[in-house]
Amino acid sequence: MKAVLLVSGGMDSLVATALAHHHGFELAAMHVNYGQRTWQKELECFRQICDHYGIEKRLEIDAGFLGAIGGSSLTDAAIPVGPADLAGTDIPTSYVPFRNANFLSMAVSWSEVIGANRIYIGAVEEDSSGYPDCRKVFYDAFNQVIEHGTRPETSIEIVTPLIDMSKAEIVKRGMELDAPFHFSWSCYKSEGKACGVCDSCARRLRAFASVGIADPVEYEVRPDYLQ
């Protein structure tokens, strides 16, 4: 069975890739450049992850229109990337409006063409920044969209293997699968050393610290987010 992987180059998509590989799928990987601040580093990590898992079928998509639409600190230089707020409940400025729906639509199109039956995405609901398009209900609904919007003979299902996991659990599972975390990038701000203070860096650092494992990525600062 063939699976399309949405691989950003981040920690979650890496572990989702490791799981799909572990389950024996024939893998095809998609990466989307949507004008994000760290697009070059993320693309580099995508290629390294694909090389590591021997994924030859790859699709790199330019979705710069999401950057042109704006509305997110990830794509708009005029909107600063705020510091981590791990206890916050508001949707942060890093939310890219309806981004994952756009990604999934492209993945479904490609899956129909190449005959893939599964789409893996490393979405996390329980221990995330509160993005509305990272909720299980969203993916359940999108599976209905696929069913009603593709050919009758098409059978494609979105798989979200990490959706109910904490970031610490994701790190543990990745270590069990020998996932190459050094090929992943989570920082929202920097392509050199990870900043260590954005929300994504904070959640990653806290996860690694929670399981007592050193994050192999180099940081400008490594605050203690377990306090």
UniProtKB/Swiss-Prot annotation:
The keyword Transferase does not apply. It catalyses: 7-carboxy-7-deazaguanine + NH4(+) + ATP = 7-cyano-7-deazaguanine + ADP + phosphate + H2O + H(+). ATP binds at residues 7-17. It is an enzyme of class 6 (ligase). The keyword Endoplasmic reticulum does not apply. Keywords: ATP-binding, Ligase, Metal-binding, Nucleotide-binding, Queuosine biosynthesis, Zinc. Binds 1 zinc ion per subunit. Gene3D superfamilies: HUPs. Belongs to the QueC family. This is 7-cyano-7-deazaguanine synthase.
